[in-house]
């Protein structure tokens, strides 16, 4: 979460007149994140989150995202619920931006995830995948394998300024991923960005999943691969197989992986690492000095990609068949 658009008191007051959430007591910008402008609203009925959707979010996708939150919340997935205005709509306009209010979730995200966090994350992810199974709207994953080549092309000319030889390495890896990428794994709704800062815990118990604005239809096991990258490394290079084992084991207690999904884990993990390497590389090269959000180091995912390329098989992630 972050703040890119300032909202005046008058504009906010007028906007909130369209809702029945109580009298506003305080409004505070939330600094974390990279995509949208977010504010904590405190009223005499409790806290809510106000989001203004910035230019990187396609307004046409917002009904999909907000509808998904409603769908998942109705199936006991701990995620924010969109709040309807007095007109019955959940999407409105504030400061020339699409805007929505969602319920507030208690909890904090784990700065240093431990095994118990990874285990609960695995179970929650499997429950999310099952709960999304009957969500009718669809959204293509624009950041899957078909989207990596355009990202690479946009960054290729300056890639070697980040690491000498990076351009050639990435092109070789892209060629391999495009040739090997599977086509017939189980698909469904995935979160696609379930990093630790998007998962809340209260007293070490998982309490919420947030930031569904990359959610889409794709391979369910790809979502697991994203989480293996985001949760199971100590630093940039040391893979913690114990964390991975607990994550995957708890996932499989709810939704067992098919043999094909299990066999594809190393390839999917390579792809997930490539996805975040490329988006970080693009942002690293194109974020101007003095920008409010500091770009994340793409080399973290270069090292993670190297790990996945070197594994001997899916057993490297702690499970065996």
Swiss-Prot record:
Keywords: Amino-acid biosynthesis, ATP-binding, Kinase, Nucleotide-binding, Threonine biosynthesis, Transferase
Gene Ontology biological process: threonine biosynthetic process
A Pfam family matched in the record: APH
Superkingdom classification of source: Bacteria
The EC number(s) this enzyme carries: 2.7.1.39
Annotated metabolic or biological route of this protein: Amino-acid biosynthesis; L-threonine biosynthesis; L-threonine from L-aspartate: step 4/5
Catalytic activity: L-homoserine + ATP = O-phospho-L-homoserine + ADP + H(+)
InterPro entries: Aminoglycoside_PTrfase, Homoserine_kinase_II, Kinase-like_dom_sf, Pseudomonas-type_ThrB
Gene Ontology molecular function: any one: homoserine kinase activity
NCBIfam families: PRK05231.1 (NF003558), thrB_alt (TIGR00938)
Family the UniProt entry places it in: Belongs to the pseudomonas-type ThrB family.
Protein name: Homoserine kinase
Lineage start: Bacteria, Pseudomonadati, Pseudomonadota, Alphaproteobacteria, Rhodospirillales
């Amino acid at each position: 979460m972050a703040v890119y658009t300032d909202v005046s008191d008058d504009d906010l007051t007028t906007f909130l007149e369209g809702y029945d959430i109580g009298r506003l007591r305080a409004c505070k910008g939330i600094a974390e994140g990279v995509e949208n402008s977010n504010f904590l609203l405190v009223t005499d009925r409790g806290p809510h989150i106000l989001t203004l959707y910035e230019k990187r979010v396609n307004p046409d996708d917002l009904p999909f995202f907000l509808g998904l939150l409603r769908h998942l919340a109705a199936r006991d997935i701990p995620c924010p619920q969109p709040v309807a205005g007095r007109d019955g709509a959940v999407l409105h306009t504030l400061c020339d931006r699409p805007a929505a209010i969602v319920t507030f979730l208690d909890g904090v995200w784990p700065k240093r995830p431990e095994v118990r966090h990874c285990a609960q994350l695995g179970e929650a992810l499997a429950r999310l995948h099952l709960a999304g199974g009957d969500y009718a709207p669809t959204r293509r994953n624009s950041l899957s394998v078909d989207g990596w080549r355009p990202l690479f092309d946009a960054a290729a000319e300056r890639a070697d300024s980040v690491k000498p030889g990076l351009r050639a390495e990435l092109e070789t890896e892209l060629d391999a991923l495009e040739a090997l990428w599977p086509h017939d794994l189980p698909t469904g709704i995935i979160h696609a960005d379930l990093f630790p800062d998007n998962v809340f815990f209260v007293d070490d118990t998982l309490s919420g999943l947030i930031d569904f604005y990359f959610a889409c239809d794709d391979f369910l096991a790809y979502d697991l691969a994203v989480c293996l990258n985001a949760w199971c490394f100590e630093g940039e290079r040391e893979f913690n197989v114990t964390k991975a084992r607990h994550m995957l084991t708890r996932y499989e207690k709810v939704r067992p992986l098919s043999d094909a999904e299990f066999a594809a884990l190393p390839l999917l993990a390579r792809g997930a690492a490539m996805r975040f390497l490329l988006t970080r590389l693009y942002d690293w090269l194109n974020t101007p000095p003095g920008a409010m959000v500091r770009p994340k180091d793409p080399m973290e995912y270069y090292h993670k990609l190297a790990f996945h390329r070197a594994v001997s098989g899916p057993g490297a992630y702690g499970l065996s068949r």
